[in-house]
Amino acid sequence: MINFFLFKGNKIIFVIILLLFSQMIFPITFKYNTGENLVKKKKEEDAREKQIKLLFEAIRKHNNKYVQFYLATEKNIRTRKMLTDKYINRSAGVYGVNLSESSLIEGDGRLVDINSKSQDGYTPIVVAIEAKNHEILKLLIENGANLYERHPIFNRTTVGTAAYYENEEAVEMLLKKDPKLANIGSTVDGWTPLEDATLKTNVKIVKILLQYGANPTITDKHGGTPMDMAVKFGKGEIVKILRDHIKANRSKYH
């Protein structure tokens, strides 16, 4: 009987030691992490969303100095790294007082990614096209913004969005960078930028699109073409432009 209790006692001591050892190696924090981490993550997401929305508001209002300061362009990334290395992360033995980022940059100094997306699906390039903010659109294109982003409501590409909003300068800027965008339609109805330009009776955009290789014979998901649309809605001038273009490029389209 005594041996049994000794064995049982030793077993309990062994279990306690094992628990203490495992706590040292793998701290038991899981029971707190779920709640605390979710709250922290939510706060970070809300702060990030607020920052993105402030950037979008600045793009829409053409407050371009604000946008240029907070957008994660190559220049800004290099500048922030230089400031961080020089004033915040000083090498050991370098004279001077280490500063915090908040003392160098007012407010939330974090940069907003070129292709950041808000919770409602907007990106800087789509907002810049809508707002006809050509200075920021140029900056985004130069810094590698995704030209294949789609409008969160209309599901059009950047060129399709520019055609829809009759943003002639944006259409040309985007096509100069990537002419293939001229023939990429909506994944919902298959409408191409040329169909949007035709419906809006925007002759200039129609001509720009054709110049960069838009195909007027491409059918959408309803079987229609830009020519069909031009005829149906009485867009006489565009009918002539499309007809002449197809005739001049007969071997290409047949």
What are the functions of these language-model segments?
Residues I28-L54, Y212, V231-H254:
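Ankyrin-repeat-protein effector appendages
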Residues Y32-S118:
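N-terminal segments that cap or nucleate solenoid repeat domains
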Residues E57-H62, V127-N133, T161-N167, D196-N202, ...:
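Ankyrin repeat A-helix N-terminal signature
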